[in-house]
Amino acid sequence: MSRFPAVAGRAPRRQEEGERSRDLQEERLSAVCIADREEKGCTSQEGGTTPTFPIQKQRKKIIQAVRDNSFLIVTGNTGSGKTTQLPKYLYEAGFSQHGMIGVTQPRKVAAISVAQRVAEEMKCTLGSKVGYQVRFDDCSSKETAIKYMTDGCLLKHILGDPNLTKFSVIILDEAHERTLTTDILFGLLKKLFQEKSPNRKEHLKVVVMSATMELAKLSAFFGNCPIFDIPGRLYPVREKFCNLIGPRDRENTAYIQAIVKVTMDIHLNEMAGDILVFLTGQFEIEKSCELLFQMAESVDYDYDVQDTTLDGLLILPCYGSMTTDQQRRIFLPPPPGIRKCVISTNISATSLTIDGIRYVVDGGFVKQLNHNPRLGLDILEVVPISKSEALQRSGRAGRTSSGKCFRIYSKDFWNQCMPDHVIPEIKRTSLTSVVLTLKCLAIHDVIRFPYLDPPNERLILEALKQLYQCDAIDRSGHVTRLGLSMVEFPLPPHLTCAVIKAASLDCEDLLLPIAAMLSVENVFIRPVDPEYQKEAEQRHRELAAKAGGFNDFATLAVIFEQCKSSGAPASWCQKHWIHWRCLFSAFRVEAQLRELIRKLKQQSDFPKETFEGPKHEVLRRCLCAGYFKNVARRSVGRTFCTMDGRGSPVHIHPSSALHEQETKLEWIIFHEVLVTTKVYARIVCPIRYEWVRDLLPKLHEFNAHDLSSVARREVREDARRRWTNKENVKQLKDGISKDVLKKMQRRNDDKSISDARARFLERKQQRTQDHSDTRKETG
């Protein structure tokens, strides 16, 4: 398991007790943290301790601005107190008398940690006056006046209460991150005020908070609403371009050694102050922690370190799949004489504020979900950050004193590879789930919905196509009864479709654990240390073997069931190199899904089907009902070809139980693809062609114009003709005419496959013979 957090240096060797347990070390750090807060804090009206923030000088003005305007934009540097103090001010000014003050955050971690902080400052129990709601965790009550939540939770609120009658103020925080859900909330709130519904509260206020964003554009979107600027108190930050990455290295992320070296140089040559390092994900972070620890252990603090007050380096990782308790450690001050180094994902750039940071190391990259039009799927890719994100990162070094930011990349990389602003998620990811939500809110014309930045029409049509394939909408683009049921599930539509199919066959027990496991982060721990790596791989192979060794979906079900039935699930996870936090989340997801299925099956018109066959076949047939878009057929060697009309080549991921068994397979379905040196299918199981034969035509038989529900009278005839022609051309390019489909069906019987393979081997043998004859003649 990971050894971090850990202290490298001579400080731990000074302790008479030897190595203390991690729990005792945390207890001491917690005591230091509490004492430090009590010493530096000031008493608020609620009697808690609140540090000073720039927003405090603007308190009266900002409260009045909220009173005077339906929409208000609040901007200020990270650390100005927007997130924690403004909701308190509005509560103390009486806004909560008419409903809750709802504050959205793009990340679950931020929603929970900020709610804990505000509850502490207001001296109340978390879940009473101050609460939070995130996916699968509602820590609020009837008493709750300030509710922090993810933007997705607010969207769910709107589904049940389109007029937001339970709220007096909605605060959309971290708007500059431009998440897909936040952008949809922009449009829904604008429509709510435009339509002047008789059920809408007249006193509902909307506040949009942003650290860096195109503020004039946002103001114009909300009817030229005022912008309230909170003057910052950032100290000067010196920036240094280290020139270790240039424009030609845009796709090269093998920069960990360089980042560790820069971090170590800071520790040796700079005066006291904590370090914040930005990397893209868990693997990079854990590897960097390991390398940094090895280097820091060899330091002679009597001769190598410029600041003689330093005795060691406390190394702390920070990424999304860590437990809440693990993430809390980064906020605690280090022991005397110890420099803290937090190695984090982008979560520490805006959502979390860590005191004491004086040095920032900016790796220049971030993991980002992008839609791949060639594959028709969302792909998690490592891409350069934007200039606005880079400024956010450097600003972390100037919150409490002057600081320094070390940028790994060059100035040319800054100018040529980094966009000015974050590309909104709505312009680069799948819109399937949000389009279904809009349809369920009776917003049928999703193309002309009021978007701050309208997405590419192709993405909207792709979403409509996928919803039609799942039977969530009909041929006219109207939501079906199934679609209304699907929107209640916290799952992607295709996975929801598979779960509902299983419920109709009365075998949901087979699918629910798998759906729960697929809805949490990757459960497998893959350590960096080679020795531990071999042990982890062996344990994972054993788990796959218990599932039959030929179905990654079934492996997830085995992990779920075995962990849940063990007497000590956390210990079981540790032994098998599985993330206990992810399993714990999966247990909660499964319970929620089971309750949703129970209510669904109580409906009088819920369809019931029967199927006689072994369990493993029923499971795979149910998966086909939702995943038929992700069907692939083996083509040449170990390569598979997708059947969605694009014919994209994919390879089975090395982590799959089916890796190196490709020659035994003909047809597969997969959960997702990863793009590295190749396009990999991840979480795979074999299927039979006859299971998807009747489903594959649905990938091609649809009319984009009908599905979009565009008001036909408002579309000029020539525009409709161009649209129809474009669709016809696309179908011709993709080769998806009915004749082709019929040919495909004829090609896919066992005899045709066998004959085709024989012809391929014959041609290959002939080419080899010709090549050999040519060489002989040349010789």
Swiss-Prot record:
Keywords of the record: ATP-binding, Helicase, Hydrolase, Nucleotide-binding
Determine the domain of life of the protein's source: Eukaryota
Its biological function? Probable ATP-dependent RNA helicase.
Protein name per Swiss-Prot or TrEMBL: Probable ATP-dependent RNA helicase DHX40
E.C. number(s) listed in UniProt? 3.6.4.13
User: What CDD domains does UniProt report for this protein, alphabetically?
Assistant: DEXHc_DHX40 (cd17984), SF2_C_RHA (cd18791)
Extract the GO molecular function terms from the UniProt entry: 3'-5' RNA helicase activity; ATP binding; ATP hydrolysis activity; RNA binding
Q: What is the similarity comment for this entry?
A: Belongs to the DEAD box helicase family. DEAH subfamily.
Q: Name one Pfam family in it.
A: OB_NTP_bind
Residues of the region (Disordered) are 1-28, 737-779
Q: What does the record give as the reaction this protein catalyses? A: ATP + H2O = ADP + phosphate + H(+)
Q: What class of enzyme is it?
A: hydrolase
Q: What positions does the domain Helicase ATP-binding occupy?
A: 63-231
Instruction: Give the stretches traversing the membrane.
Output: none
Describe tissue expression.
Ubiquitously expressed.
